[in-house]
């Protein structure tokens, strides 16, 4: 490339031919190892040329102008300029070394040696003039500043040290923000429904869950045995009655939190056998099929639920009692003792037919001892101590447990007994009290208001 052309990068104060090299002769530049070995770096190039006479070669492309340029190299004024350039170059070199020590990962903008400059024709004269040195120095500072500033932003972590907040413990109090409250309700309602399904599926237990939103919607989940509590008309009325009732006053204080071990277990209980547990997990079993558990448990559960919710005693007690009679009548493979209808008179309790005592106000249903054989005596005593059952002592010394039922439940039991049992129940005229054991076991008796 001819340095005398119009490119400003090659408008130099001297010619490359003054140091014995010509850009038009690449053989001397690359083919002579002696020149390559003895070539000084660009930093000390001008200093070594101070007392050396110039070696000129014929350069037809350069023409005549190199002669006056070579004369200016040996003038005293030019020598002082060379010293100033050398001092400035040394200072800039020291600054670059300091920057390299502080930021070793940044290698851009550093001054290259003379051998590197000769390998690149376009940058061969960049470090030989004051203008070129200024450009290199400014480029080094600019590059270092431009490359240094974005790095802390890319590698620095967030202010909190984490990308997300993670698990945050919230206060167990009412959420005032409506949007947050609705979002929390939706998420936690879905979660608790899923947990109820998992509990019933994994353990085979009966689960019933009811969630009422503040917008008036009711969401429920129930397994097979507990579905009548939600789907039956009595269950729906009970739910609506409870939800429409005013908020009860807090017993333990308004700020009392629900503990992990309290307010969960109730006094309700039921018996379950091996076949009954298999029946629970069978999806094809119907509600009217009888199992090994005693049919007495249904009225007992009805009475206990009625005791828990006295305001809606009629609705809760009626369907279990009706299903109990239906299950007793439809059981074909298992014969349960028939209910003995008993009327209390002035002369003492006497056994009569079901039809004859239908209109008596103080009539009672008494289960025989065989029908309650599956109920543990300990459980009965616990129910008596809790107040769910009532114990009455008769004249003969036997103790009877009575379960008060409403008039609606009594009429249902009487009508079902008349249609299902017929004359079979009237044929059994044996008093139930005579079946009591020697240690006077507890006997369940149903008493109507």
Curated annotation (Swiss-Prot):
The modification Phosphoserine is found at residue 156. Keywords: Activator, Developmental protein, DNA-binding, Nucleus, Phosphoprotein, Transcription, Transcription regulation. One of its GO terms (molecular function) is protein dimerization activity. SMART domains: MADS (SM00432). Pfam families: SRF-TF. SUPFAM superfamilies: SRF-like (SSF55455). Residues 81-107, 317-331, 345-354 have a biased composition (Low complexity). Residues 167-225 form the MADS-box domain. It comes from the Eukaryota. After germ band retraction, high levels of zygotic expression are observed in a distinct subset of peripheral tracheal cells distributed throughout the embryo and low levels in somatic muscle. Expressed in the future intervein tissue of the wing imaginal disk from the third instar larvae until eclosion of the adult fly (at protein level). It is found in: Nucleus. One of its GO terms (cellular component) is nucleus. One of its GO terms (biological process) is instar larval development. Residues 69-80 have a biased composition (Polar residues). Residues 23-166, 270-360, 418-449 are annotated as: Disordered. Required for the formation of intervein tissue of the wing. Acts in a dosage-dependent manner to suppress wing vein formation and promote development of intervein cells. Might play a role in the proper formation and maintenance of the trachea. PANTHER family: SERUM RESPONSE FACTOR HOMOLOG. This is Serum response factor homolog. It comes from Drosophila melanogaster (Fruit fly). The gene is bs.
């Amino acid at each position: 490339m001819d340095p005398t052309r119009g490119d400003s990068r090659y408008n130099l104060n001297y010619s490359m031919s003054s140091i014995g090299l010509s850009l038009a002769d690449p053989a001397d530049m690359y083919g002579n190892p002696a020149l390559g070995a003895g070539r000084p770096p660009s930093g000390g190039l001008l200093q070594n040329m101070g007392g050396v006479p110039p070696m000129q070669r014929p350069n037809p492309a350069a023409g005549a102008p190199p002669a006056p340029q070579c004369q200016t190299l040996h003038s005293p004024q030019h020598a002082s300029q060379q010293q100033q350039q050398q001092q400035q170059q040394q200072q800039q070199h020291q600054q670059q070394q300091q920057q390299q020590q502080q930021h070793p990962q940044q290698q851009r903008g550093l001054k290259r040696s003379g051998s590197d400059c000769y390998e690149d024709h376009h940058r061969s004269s960049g470090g030989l003039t004051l203008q070129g040195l200024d450009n290199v120095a400014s480029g080094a500072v600019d590059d270092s500043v431009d490359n240094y500033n974005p790095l802390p932003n890319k590698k620095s972590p967030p202010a909190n040290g984490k990308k997300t907040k993670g698990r945050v413990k919230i206060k167990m109090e009412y959420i005032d923000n409506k949007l947050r409250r609705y979002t929390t309700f939706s998420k936690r309602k879905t979660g608790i429904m899923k947990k109820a399904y998992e509990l019933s599926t994994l353990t085979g237990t009966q689960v019933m869950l009811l969630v009422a939103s503040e917008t008036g919607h009711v969401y429920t989940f129930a397994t097979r045995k507990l579905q009548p509590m939600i789907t039956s008309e009595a269950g729906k009325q009970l739910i609506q009655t409870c939800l429409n009732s005013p908020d009860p006053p807090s017993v333990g204080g308004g700020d009392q939190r629900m503990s992990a071990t309290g307010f969960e277990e109730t006094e309700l209980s039921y018996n379950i056998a091996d076949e009954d547990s298999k029946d629970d997990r069978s999806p094809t079993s119907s509600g009217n099929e009888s199992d090994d558990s005693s049919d007495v448990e249904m009225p007992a559960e009805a009475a206990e639920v009625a005791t828990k919710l006295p305001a809606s005693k009629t609705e809760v007690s009626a369907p279990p009692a009706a299903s109990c009679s239906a299950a007793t009548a439809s059981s074909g493979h298992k014969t349960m003792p028939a209910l003995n209808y008993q009327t209390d008179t002035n002369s003492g309790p006497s056994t009569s037919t079901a039809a004859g005592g239908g209109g008596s106000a103080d009539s009672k249903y008494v289960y025989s001892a065989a029908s309650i054989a599956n109920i543990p005596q300990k459980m009965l005593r616990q129910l008596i101590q809790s107040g769910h059952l009532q114990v009455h002592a008769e004249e003969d010394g036997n103790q009877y447990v009575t379960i008060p039922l409403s008039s609606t439940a009594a009429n249902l039991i009487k009508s079902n007994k008349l249609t299902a049992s017929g004359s079979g129940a009237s044929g059994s005229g044996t008093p139930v009290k005579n079946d009591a054991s020697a240690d006077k076991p507890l006997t369940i008796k149903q008493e109507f208001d």
